[in-house]
Amino acid sequence: MKVRVLFFASVADAAGTRSLDVEVEARATVGDLRRKLESERPRLAGKLGKCAAAVNTAVVAATRSLAEGDEVAFLPPVSGGTR
């Protein structure tokens, strides 16, 4: 099945793109997708584990199952601001 993956900020830089369509096995989880992406794109290794994952705009756990057409966003930690 196919899912759409969105990357932001430094993770998009490491991925070399802001979005891509990825083919995953039926009953794949967010964690499975994360491992697949890190395996296929070595520059992502170690980065996606630090990101929150959102499926169809809802933040989810790595154990969340994916469905055909889901949109998965990897959201890197945010820092900065002023005091």
Identify what each model region corresponds to.
Residues M1-R83:
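Ubiquitin-like/PB1-type beta-grasp interaction modules and other compact soluble beta-rich domains
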